[in-house]
């Protein structure tokens, strides 16, 4: 899968969480996971910024997000 295709798939899946202000859980391709609220999602630049409770704000290139790992964050593993 190309980086452009990965970025577009990630954007499409993350848009729902961004528009509805739902906490999201995802992993990058190094299998590091992130949980947070998306505070910025840019389709032109294919970037996003999430706000995590503990670590603060993180910028991401959407090509680095594994689109298959994107899901609603369930606090406490429920």
Each language-model region and where it sits:
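Short glycine-rich, low-complexity segments
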Residues: 1-35, 53-78
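Short, conserved beta-turn/loop elements at beta-strand boundaries and strand-helix junctions
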Residues: 41-47, 75
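Beta-strand residues in well-ordered beta-sheet regions across diverse protein folds
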Residues: 49-51
